């Protein structure tokens, strides 16, 4: 039986909002991630699962990227990456990003479970850990947190 989750993204003092869905058809199988985010500037925006499902002080309460394996930041296809590193979403000229990702590192159960954690869309492009400085190995230089939401169990 498939496991499903959903995240409603809301702007942290920004007009950014969206709905992102997650589905994992088998326990150790890939997770499909899809949905739409609006209110963005045109171009790439970092897209990560952060450690905590805490938005009490806005998106900053979510903590760092979800990284249970204590690795350096990377891209979604890299061996060396945080579990929560989902790369970038691309917004069109109207500020809308259509999201369609399949990821085999995140999970909806077990040690890499993202349910109850916060999904964040960032101000800038994620350099995927290749920016040549220390911040790149932690955050991908993706900048401030534009919008976030806690990932919850869905029907």
Curated annotation (Swiss-Prot):
Its EC number is 1.15.1.1. Its main location: cytoplasm. The modification Phosphoserine is found at residues 100, 104, 107, 109. The modification N-acetylalanine is found at residue 2. The modification N6-acetyllysine is found at residues 124, 138. Binds 1 copper ion per subunit. Keywords: Acetylation, Antioxidant, Copper, Cytoplasm, Disulfide bond, Lipoprotein, Metal-binding, Nucleus, Oxidoreductase, Palmitate, Phosphoprotein, Zinc. Zn(2+) binds at residues 65, 73, 82, 85. Destroys radicals which are normally produced within the cells and which are toxic to biological systems. Homodimer; non-disulfide-linked. Heterodimer with SOD1. The heterodimer CCS:SOD1 interacts with SLC31A1; this heterotrimer is Cu(1+)-mediated and its maintenance is regulated through SOD1 activation. This is Superoxide dismutase [Cu-Zn]. It comes from Pongo pygmaeus. The lineage of its organism: Eukaryota, Metazoa, Chordata, Craniata, Vertebrata. The gene is SOD1.
């Amino acid at each position: 039986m498939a496991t499903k989750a959903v995240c409603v993204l809301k702007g942290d003092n920004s007009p950014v909002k969206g709905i992102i869905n997650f589905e994992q058809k088998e326990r150790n199988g890939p997770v499909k991630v899809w949905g739409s985010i609006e209110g963005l500037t045109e171009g790439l925006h970092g897209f990560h699962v952060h450690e905590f499902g805490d938005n009490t002080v806005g998106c900053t309460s979510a903590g760092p990227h979800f990284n249970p394996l204590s690795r350096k930041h990377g891209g979604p296809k890299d061996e060396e990456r945080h579990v929560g590193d989902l790369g970038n979403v691309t917004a069109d000229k109207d500020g809308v990003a259509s999201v369609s990702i399949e990821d085999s590192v995140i999970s909806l159960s077990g040690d890499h479970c993202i349910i109850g954690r916060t999904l964040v869309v960032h101000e800038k492009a994620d350099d995927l850990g290749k920016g040549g400085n220390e911040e790149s190995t932690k955050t991908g230089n993706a900048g401030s947190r534009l919008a976030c939401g806690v990932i919850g169990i869905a029907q």
